């Protein structure tokens, strides 16, 4: 007669710990992360090509540096990277394909092969321009101007700008600001705006299917 094998409780817990640790280790190393810092002395405009980037976050600081952080995940993550290029006073950021290997035709659509997020910290009072096909955008801080155009994602802005234009197709637009003239219109969605103190700052908010909400910044 075979003796039963008894697994002690502490062994079960230890194995569970090893499994969780292994999974955590795999998740950490499964991502392609990148951080870059550059001087902002000669930069007055940030141009973000957000195509194929799912989440874009921009925040202003009192520092005179630009900090760019990106995380890429997915089957072909190592074949892409966030590229920075300065032309005159403009800094361009985009997700570029950097591999010499071809991606199979059935996986050409980038959202099948990579999930990208981008976080950018910039000095105050710069111009910010963002366009994206799939991305959602969160913006916080003080800007000279803001221009955002999104095909699918939403847009949240908390801060100030001398002028702003935000266009979405399906995504909602939420703005918290003050001392501004607001022109908001959604073709198939709802628009709601708090009464703000009039000023020379003008914001144009447009959406086809998304809702637009404007509140006074506390």
Task: For every predicted segment, state its role.
Residues 155, 173-175, 212:
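Fold-core signature of tandem repeat domains
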Residues 5-10, 14-17, 140, 158, ...:
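Residue-level detector of intrinsically disordered/flexible regions characterized by low predicted structural confidence
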Residues 31-49, 53-127, 147, 158, ...:
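Acidic (Asp/Glu) and glycine-rich low-complexity loops/linkers
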Residues 129-166:
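Right-handed parallel beta-helix
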Residues 190-192:
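Membrane-helix boundary connector in multi-pass membrane proteins
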Residues 1-35:
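Bacterial Sec-dependent N-terminal signal peptides
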């Amino acid at each position: 007669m075979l003796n039963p094998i008894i697994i002690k409780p502490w062994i079960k817990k230890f194995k569970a710990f090893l499994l969780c640790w292994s999974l955590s280790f795999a998740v950490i190393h499964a991502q392609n992360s990148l951080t870059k810092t550059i001087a902002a002395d000669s930069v007055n405009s940030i141009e973000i090509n957000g195509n194929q980037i799912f989440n874009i976050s921009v925040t202003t600081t009192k520092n005179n540096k630009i900090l760019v952080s990106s995380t890429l995940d997915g089957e072909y993550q190592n074949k892409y990277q966030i590229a920075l290029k300065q032309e005159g006073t403009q800094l361009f950021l985009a997700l570029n394909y950097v591999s010499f290997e071809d991606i199979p035709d059935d996986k050409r659509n980038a959202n099948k092969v990579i999930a990208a997020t981008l976080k950018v910290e910039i000095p105050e009072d710069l111009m910010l321009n963002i366009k994206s096909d799939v991305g959602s955008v969160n913006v916080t801080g003080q800007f000279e101007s803001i221009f955002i155009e999104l095909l699918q994602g939403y847009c949240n802005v908390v801060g100030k700008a001398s002028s702003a234009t935000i266009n979405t197709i399906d995504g909602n637009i939420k703005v918290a600001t003050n001392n501004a003239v607001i022109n908001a219109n959604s073709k198939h969605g709802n628009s709601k705006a708090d009464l703000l103190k009039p000023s020379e700052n003008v914001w144009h908010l447009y959406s086809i299917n998304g809702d637009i909400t404007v509140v006074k910044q506390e």
